[in-house]
């Protein structure tokens, strides 16, 4: 059987298993090739093609239909999209991991991505019931799922990666799904660029890293961290974290933005080492 035919029937199998979410195009649009054109435009504009942003989806569909109907390539029909700035929150272009996955997200249909992600989750030892719940979670677009899964899959040898997927199920909205995605990316970045993480450890609803030199690494993709009740509870949990049989010499906090003076003061008072942007 030719590869294209095999891929087609494999994709149909994914379609019949769980259906598509609200942020995904219909099967008809996928099979006639429109969705592939739309993904090209989204990739060119640097936005999430599966975003729930209605303004973005409307404008993106308009541009993609024009290009699809006229057979015009992305390079020949560039035009601004209203709402793209609103969707920029969901598009992270600066991370090395995301850059390396752009072609995967561009070329693969949602069913293809779901297959790839399922295989990687199985390899990580995630139970089938958890895999199903994660891959059909309404808060996660195929982009969120794919980047998160690939970030963890690339951290080969790190223990408890399957626990991260379980924690990620706590997400109720797209913003929270994006938060878990970015946390996975940041842990991956620390693991590959700073020093290797030995295992992932649960702390409340999140996961932190534990290195071979006995350092706890917590990552927070936040622009500005205020001192509020959640900050108080989270920092207290990190400061008091007790890993049976595994001593903790230092606890590091990595944020993509910065802390308010009050938050920095409180974190430092608890012995937490903060790394700001």
Task: Kindly give the residue locations of the regions a language model identified.
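Glycine-/small-residue-rich active-site loops that bind phosphorylated ligands and cofactors
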Residues: 26, 225, 259
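C-terminal low-complexity, largely alpha-helical membrane/lipid-association modules
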Residues: 1-69
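Acidic-basic catalytic patches of nuclease active cores, encompassing PD-(D/E)XK
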Residues: 119-206
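Membrane-engaging insertion elements
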Residues: 2-3, 89-129
